[in-house]
Each structure stands twice: as C-alpha cells, then as structure tokens.
C-alpha cells in the first residue's frame, strides 16, 4: 500500500509541476467580437426638460432597437438632445441620419438634429462583425392632462 501511495504522490507532484510551468501566450491581446451596445442615456439638459439623464431606454439586442418605453412630455424638442452610449471595445460607431454619417468615437460634436430616426452601426474591435441599431425617441403627441373628444359621433 505504501508503494501505491508513493507512486500516486509522484504522479500528482509531476502533474503540478508540469501545469505550473505552462507558458502563456505573451504579447497577444484578446480582440473582442462584441457588437453590443450596453448602455444608452440622454445627457442632462435643464433648459429642455428636467431629469433627462434619468429617462430609461430599452436596448433590444435581437431586433436592434433602442427606444424609451415611457414617452417624453409633449413639446420636447428632440433635436436639441445629447446622448451617451457605451459598447464593449467597438472599433467604430457610425451614426447615420437622413443624409449624413458620423463616427461617434471620433466626433465629439455631433449635430443637434440627430434624433430623426437614426441608425447606429457598431463594428467589433476585430472588424469581423457589424450590428445595426434603430434609435427611436418617443414623445407624447397629445397633452396627457387634457381630454380630447374630437371625432366622437353620437
């Protein structure tokens, strides 16, 4: 029994030494293939409406949609809203409006009229993958504090 225990100890010791001496790949940085937008938020702007930075946005990764489920108040001027978005090491974030494309990572001063339905294209760090997102900011069409009886026939 002591010989068996001795051999098992040698084998375990040898395995520990061999695995501890395994050389790791040095100089290689892993490249991300993620095209996920992990966060989207409006920047605070008290001249437009209060608490803009607290508006919750839904990011639907399967359908490629970014939208606010709870609409902004009627009369909100969406052409003056600024935003931030976060990705996981994207190499490019291209935002396309009606006629122009902007690189979000290279251009800090995006135009004010960005929020016509905009398309956001995220390119992975490796450049192998692309994902398109549709940005839609919902605003109330009617004043929720008033009753509308137009179009009702008796």
State where each predicted segment sits:
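Bacterial N-terminal signal peptides that target proteins for export
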Residues: 1-9
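Predominantly extracytoplasmic/ectodomain segments of secreted and cell-surface proteins
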Residues: 22-154
């Amino acid at each position: 029994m002591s010989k068996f225990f001795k051999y098992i100890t040698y084998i375990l010791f040898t395995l520990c030494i061999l695995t501890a001496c395994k050389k790791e790949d040095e100089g290689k940085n892993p490249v991300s293939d993620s095209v996920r937008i992990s966060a989207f938020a409006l920047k605070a702007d008290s001249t437009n409406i209060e608490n803009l930075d607290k508006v919750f946005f839904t990011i639907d990764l399967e359908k490629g949609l970014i939208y606010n489920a709870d609409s902004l108040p009627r009369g909100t001027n969406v052409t003056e809203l600024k935003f931030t978005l976060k990705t996981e090491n994207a190499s490019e974030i291209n935002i396309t409006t009606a006629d122009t494309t902007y690189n979000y990572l290279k251009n800090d001063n995006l135009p004010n009229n960005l929020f016509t339905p905009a398309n956001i294209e995220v390119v992975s760090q490796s450049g192998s993958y692309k994902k398109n997102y549709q940005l839609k900011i919902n605003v109330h069409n009617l004043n929720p504090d008033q009753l509308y009886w137009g179009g009702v026939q008796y």
